[in-house]
Curated annotation (Swiss-Prot):
Record's protein name: Aquaporin TIP2-2
Cystine bridges: none
Taxonomic source organism: Zea mays
Alphabetical list of InterPro entries matching this protein: Aquaporin-like, Aquaporin_transptr, MIP, MIP_CS
Pfam families per record: MIP (PF00230)
GO MF annotations in UniProt: water channel activity
Notes on the domains: Aquaporins contain two tandem repeats each containing three membrane-spanning domains and a pore-forming loop with the signature motif Asn-Pro-Ala (NPA).
Length: 250
């Protein structure tokens, strides 16, 4: 059952909430800077060569490590979402209000965009790689890929961070979240690009002024994140969690 709560303007503009938005902006900026930067670095080291297995592994590891750090540094302030699909999945389960979640989205998208604009500046205007489905993969297939891998990501967030029964498992949440993202990039990278994160795809699109196919990385991740929130919230949390009221974020 969907547990969306709209929330109040007062709560969404409280000092605590504003600190959370700043934390999301900074953490998303750091994550995207390292993730996209690793792809640019691969191109620099290979003189623009095609992505090979070693390059894919390196980029996946860079994303996993950067997300681990990003979630860790923001967790105590904002919950460490760094991803509109994660925020949406948590909103579906009643862990963050819709209004506060929208401001999380703004912070995440701004952080990703600033990261990519900074990369463009510090690399002397090098092309910013954007997400896109590979040749032989249709956009519909890309959407399905993104649904599945984002479901895995948000399900992991629920199991390790949002579930009130998590206990000591919560201490490894950033590691588990980073690992699943790295693994999913290895699995889906050659096909859909392995985004799982609308902000991660939006930032490069802004810097490159190229939004071709960007819808894939909104539709797929939001469906996957929402489904994970529904499934985990109803099946494994059920009535043991009170719907968000005064609490604004996970």
């Amino acid at each position: 059952m969907v547990k969306l709560a709209f929330g109040s303007v007062g709560d969404s503009f409280s000092v605590t909430s504003i600190k959370a938005y700043v934390a999301e902006f900074i953490a998303t900026l750091l994550f995207v800077f390292a993730g996209v930067g690793s792809a640019i670095a691969f191109g620099q080291l290979t003189n623009g060569g095609a992505l090979d297995p070693a390059g894919l592994v390196a980029i996946a590891v860079a994303h996993a490590l950067a997300l681990f750090v990003g979630v860790s540094v923001a967790a105590n302030t904002s919950g460490g979402h760094l991803n509109p699909a994660v925020t949406f999945g948590l909103a579906v389960g009643g862990h963050i209000t819709v209004l506060t979640g929208l401001f999380y989205w703004v912070a995440q998208l701004l952080g990703a965009s600033v990261a990519c604009l900074l990369l463009r500046f510090v690399t002397h205007g090098k092309a910013i790689p954007t997400h896109g489905v590979s040749g032989g993969t249709t956009e519909l297939e890309g959407v399905v890929f993104e649904i599945v891998i984002t479901f895995a990501l948000v399900y992991t967030v629920y199991a390790t961070a949002a579930d009130p029964k998590k206990g000591s498992l919560g201490t490894i949440a950033p590691i588990a979240i980073g690992f699943i993202v790295g693994a999913n990039i290895l699995a889906a990278g050659p096909f859909s690009g392995g985004s799982m994160n609308p902000a991660r795809s939006f930032g490069p699109a802004v810097a490159a002024a190229d939004f071709a196919g960007n819808w894939v990385y909104w539709v797929g991740p939001l469906i996957g994140g929402g489904l994970a929130g529904l499934v985990y919230g109803d099946v494994f949390i059920g009535g043991s969690y009170q719907q968000v009221a005064d609490q604004d974020y996970a």
